[in-house]
Amino acid sequence: MINYRHLFFVVFLFFYGCVETLISVTIIPDGRYHVKIESQGDERDIKDKDFNLPSSSNWSVEEFQKQDIDSDETIFVRSAESLLSGRNFLGDNGQLGSLRYPISVEKKKGIFSDTYTLIQIFEGRNIDKKYPMLSKSLLNPGNNKLENRVQTEIIMYCLRRSMKDVSTDQNVEALLQERILNHFNGVFFKAEEENKLFEILNEGDEEKVEFLNLPEKLVRTNFKPFVDLLPRNFIDNCINRMRDYLHEANVTIQLNDDTFKFVGTLPGVVFSSNADSISSDSLWWIFDLKDFMNESFTIEAASVVYYPQKIQQTIVLGALVILIVLFFIAKRKAKS
């Protein structure tokens, strides 16, 4: 019999949705910069909140639909734009695991020129460290042996981190934490051997399969042997904290099929950048989750605006000073 839950999870993991996000940044001479972020794709995929567009009062937000010319499918579009200055912490909504992409633009005034520096960072997800099986699966889709263990790995990571966080306040010894983790590992190992792993993780929920859910009943059941050894409310606090870490994992998985394009326009002459390509006066970067799976992905560019008139004035002034000095030297020599 086909395990449809397993099949859906695998399909979701590797083919779920497709959202393309274009980030356009134009720096104006006074050092401020116009930012427009536009995501387009399936409406559900855009609203899954793996990539958060700014929505504060200083941003103009728009949502609309359009028809794809080739496929005649409906494309959902959400955009946000604003005029900013300095550094802005985009994507930081205060929720653990949200993709943050801070941006900074700096203008340095000089005597003969002004320099502009643009930096935007897509913070790394640290997948290799957090979920090594998921990392391998994303890089090698179709490996069933790895795919079968991804969900267990993520749940165990969430449990481990939540127990560590809660134990800091409730003083649960590290040895007891390890005993609990070993117990859960044993439960998952046995379920995998009996081909019941996805059943116990999904707890009979046929509908809610779009993302990883917390198997709360399973967690509470397997905490029972340790209830008398744990502080009051420890289990409840752990479960609440697990939801935060599970959100982080869901964001990472949902980012798997997202693509990003960044176009930057700077005043003057660009003298440094790590752009993928240059078109007219614009710098282009194209990237996806693989570029920030572990380490952060950084967009960097710098330009300079020279002021020829100031340079000419300085040269003329310098020449006049030299001539005056030479004149007085010559005059003094003539007198002597």
Predicted segments, located by residue:
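Acidic, low-complexity intrinsically disordered regions
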Residues: 1, 55, 280-281
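Bacterial Sec-dependent N-terminal signal peptides
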Residues: 1-22, 323-336
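Intrinsically disordered, low-complexity N-terminal regions enriched in serine/proline/glycine
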Residues: 3, 15, 32, 305-306
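Short, solvent-exposed secondary-structure boundary motifs
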Residues: 13-18, 51-58, 260, 264-266
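Start-of-domain marker
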Residues: 19-76
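Mature, soluble, non-transmembrane domains
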Residues: 62-320, 328
